[in-house]
UniProtKB/Swiss-Prot annotation:
Leader sequence residues: 1-19
Species of provenance: Trittame loki (Brush-footed trapdoor spider)
A Pfam family assignment: Cys_Knot_tox
Key words, A-Z: Disulfide bond, Ion channel impairing toxin, Knottin, Neurotoxin, Secreted, Signal, Toxin
Cysteine disulfide links: 41-55, 41-82, 54-67, 85-92
Predominant place of localization: secreted
Protein location: Secreted
Role according to the record: Probable neurotoxin with ion channel impairing activity.
Notes concerning its domains: The presence of a 'disulfide through disulfide knot' structurally defines this protein as a knottin.
InterPro entries with a match to the protein in the record: Cys_Knot_tox (IPR035311)
Protein name in UniProt: Toxin ICK-14
Single GO MF descriptor: ion channel regulator activity
Secreted among keywords: yes
Record flagged with keyword Metal-binding: no
Amino acid sequence: MKPIVSILLFCALAVVIVGRRRSTGRGIPYVDEKLPNGQRCKPPGFDCSKSEECCGPQDTKNYAHGCAPQWSGMWNKRVNECYICYIESSSC
């Protein structure tokens, strides 16, 4: 009985850790610029296909940005979203 309970707890913990949505950096100031194709860059949390479409942070020394897969509960699958994160954090 104990091994079964241990396995169930491990599985539940793994689902919580792996399934956690990463912060996209919505509150971090970013540079809203015009891209070479004439469109505006996409802010954190918006859908993207490549990193060049995403707005960069104002503080480029401490923050990084890009386009990465995020879990979407609305679509029930992974979608690419722009993000900005603190370089020294473990989630970046």
